[in-house]
Amino acid sequence: SSGTRTVTIADITDFHGHIERGADNATAFTVADSHNPGNMIPVSTGDLVGGSPYESAVEKDQPTLDMAKAWGLTISAIGNHEFDRGVADFNNRIADPSNGIDWLCANASAANKSPDGLLSHVRDSTIRTVNGKRIGFVGALTDALGSVATPQITRDADLDERAVDAINRVARELKRSGKVDAVVALLHADASAAADIGRDVDVVYTGHSHAIKHGTTAGGAPIYEAGSFGRNMAVQDLIITGAGRRATVRVADVDLGNGTSHTAVDGVLGVDGLNAHPAQAAWMSAGAEENDEVSRAQHIYQASATYANHTGSAVIGTLASGVNFDKQGSDKHGNTVGVLVADANRESIMKHVYAGNRLPVIGFSNNGSLRTPRLDMNGDGKVTVRE
């Protein structure tokens, strides 16, 4: 279409399997769609899975993938936590086409994304045609993968180009080919890493640092980072005039209306307890409970919670009265639950060390990746599989 049309983008990032918030996110996506009916595209900027609560982790995050399908989410950048169980597990299971998501990572080597590569289900970009406009999506993974993943994962992922350079390259190819009318970048890195993205990108969504941020690229495009754990969502309208190489794009923040808890960053909204805008009252009069996406999300969580309660309730240890392991203190300087994890890692290694070994054996933990505030969450002195 050569006229002016509006396409809405709704982005989440670093969801990390928090399916307990899945229904809130389903509501937010459907309200975003009711703002521009049939013309909303939900996206993720990575770490959709991995580092997850027990309800999702115990089933290897399949409930989260099912939740994403319920939302209608079909596009995501790869985050480092997608590789938590290895690159092969990501490619063969998480990125299996049956889950319905196009996973994007333009800075992974072309050879790795070939049919015989370790990331054969990954691509540089994908295109959606909505409301008569063609939207190109380009994804990339943080250049700091080596500092947050094991050497084996870093080798298997084979990132051979700077993330921003890869985004600029693919965006330029898309724009100059005339195949798209707008380009959206999904960069799994802190918002500051997107500063050098060029003029061929119209809007950038970032993640990884779990922050809520806004910025501007060197090319003048807005940058958004929408927090983590399903608490927030960035929603923007792309107002597109013309087509192909002659298209112009204006980006406008969307207010989802009453009940939205606004953050300090324009364009990034809280999704807990979201109600509809008065103009959307007719849609809401049917009740969110009757909405397919919301009811499916609720069912997925309820089924997963039931299974998690069954598998996670067994008591595997006890704590003396008044003793607990918690995450108080600094991620950089340690805390008692982190020391416990390091000790447990050492004990696990010691089971495989031959009796005559004279070398020191050291256990490590990454305090920044600990997701629980304390070991004995309910204070009953019993440690369960779930805890």
Name each region found by the language model.
Residues 13-17, 50-54, 175, 193-197, ...:
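Solvent-exposed loop/linker segments at secondary-structure transitions
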Residues 2-262, 336-344:
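Acidic, metal/ion-coordinating pockets
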